[in-house]
Amino acid sequence: MVVNPIHANLTNHYTMTNRFKSIFCICMSLAGLMFVSCKSGSEVAGTKVGALDDSVWESSVWISAADAEVVEGKINGSNWRAADGASWFVSEVTNDRKVKSAKWMTAGLGVYDIYVNGKLIGEEVLKPGFTHYEKTKLSFTYDITDVMKTGAGAVNQLSAQVTPGWWGDKIVTPGNHEGMIGKKCAFRGVLELVYSDGTVEYIGTDLENWKAGIAGPVTHSAIFDGEFYDARIQPGYACGETLGKPEVNEEFQGTIFPSEGAEVYMRPDLTLNPVKTYVWEGVYGDSEEYYGTIVVKREVADGQVITLAPGETLVVDFGQNAAAVPSFSFKAAEGTVLTCLPSEILNDGNGAKSRGMDGPEGSCHRLNLRTPVDGMILE
């Protein structure tokens, strides 16, 4: 990671759990961001179950946020970022009678997370996963009875956050394509309520009972782009009054299939600890042909609290590539920006430009990446 701050205190308990991009020789840059998404601190609820009957999809439509940005122009080296913002969808459902059980079948055009009464549903990450963008989307169905208010007349809030990954970003869009393959993120879902008298009601996404809009702390997110997270902003499910009427999305005309066995989960049992952590500032030995070598100011022991001053860069080397997410604790003033930059290798050879190095020896080499940048603005 890289941090070029104002002052920040970080506790060096960096861990990696199998999931995302490569080795994080974490370069943190205090103007930057950490990959968190809206899972911050919330307990995961709901139980993944078999899908509802396909016929119930007829009670729903794909909906999008009317104010969502659309990337225009040919996708190339200077125009490749996904649209900014996360699309949020919120609805309140009133129980006609006492509820015996509740299931929610959902699908997304983009990476999505769902919530019931503000609680994150499902442990899967990067839902719905990679499929042929035009032919297939995967659905996820959960038993949500335990997080529902089941009394007659009780009101429950359903919500979803959808970002462009797998749909409106570079991972599915070829070069020189006019705009992204997917124009706007979308959400679709059907709630099954089984009442205590045995009757069943299906409630789907529609234009009358749902609100939608760009909201929440995730201000940018895509598979290759990384994620920008502003912790000062409330989650979208708490911003219902700022959302507007959704619009029907007819971009996807393929088939929705239940996700069965191809889900991605966090693996805490595969936690990976850093092999070396150091803070550097300044360079020596640089020339026209060489970037030079970093000046290491201090190495950091496991468990040690790190204080970074302006101009300093912290490198956390995990010693290998991994599909993973970095985890660490930090404190800083409100408005501080923390940037976490992943890297697959370190620059070496005194930063020889002839060898394809992009910085001084000992710094993170990022030239071969598609510039993923993760981060968080502290609240």
Task: Label every PLM stretch briefly.
Residues I26-A31:
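Sec-dependent N-terminal signal peptides
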Residues M34-S37:
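C-terminal motif of bacterial Sec signal peptides marking the signal peptidase cleavage site
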Residues T15-C25:
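Bacterial N-terminal signal peptides that target proteins for export
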Residues S40-E379:
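Extracellular/oxidizing-compartment recognition motifs
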